[in-house]
Amino acid sequence: MARENRDTQPNDGMQEKLIHINRVSKVVKGGRQFGFAALMVVGDGDGKVGFGRGKAKEVPAGIQKATDQARRWMTSIPLMRGGTIPYPVEGRHGAARVMLRPAPEGSGVIAGGAMRAVCEAVGLRNVVAKSLGSNNPINVVRATFDAFDKLISPQAIAMKRGKSLKEIRGQGGHDE
């Protein structure tokens, strides 16, 4: 049944990336009952991304639940020309800490594990990322989203300060 739902889903240009599947077991009188938990990231490749967790007795059903949740909880981040972020940022969740830094054109996505999948889904093409502390995939993804939440577009910063975009980027407007 879950397979039919996945095939009939419209192709809306979203990239779906499976990050982690965890098999869990519950010991009962008659033996073990197995279940599965899936962690998915969904992004449009142009600044919108979301993640979701799904639990079910079968893997495909858990993946479908995680994908549906990721599509519901999308967030957007400001992307710069060249597919990078505007400035270095750090995110935390629990013991997981991630650092994201902008990279020059042609660098590619230099990131490992769960962070690489998130960066590719959101559309980052040139970024350097480092995971510190915990390497639990769920906490690393949450820390990455925490870092994304701290990003503010240069246009929003300029508007907030009452300056032009050129002054914010350091391309003139200095009196010295």
Swiss-Prot record:
Indicate yes or no for the key word rRNA-binding: yes
Single GO MF annotation: structural constituent of ribosome
Q: Which InterPro entries match?
A: Ribosomal_Su5_D2-typ_SF (IPR020568), Ribosomal_uS5 (IPR000851), Ribosomal_uS5_bac-type (IPR005712), Ribosomal_uS5_C (IPR005324), Ribosomal_uS5_N (IPR013810), Ribsml_uS5_D2-typ_fold_subgr (IPR014721)
- What keywords were assigned to this record? Ribonucleoprotein, Ribosomal protein, RNA-binding, rRNA-binding
Task: Read off the domain note.
Answer: The N-terminal domain interacts with the head of the 30S subunit; the C-terminal domain interacts with the body and contacts protein S4. The interaction surface between S4 and S5 is involved in control of translational fidelity.
Annotated family = Belongs to the universal ribosomal protein uS5 family.
Q: How does it assemble?
A: Part of the 30S ribosomal subunit. Contacts proteins S4 and S8.
UniProt-listed PANTHER family: MITOCHONDRIAL RIBOSOMAL PROTEIN S5
Q: Know the name of this protein?
A: Small ribosomal subunit protein uS5
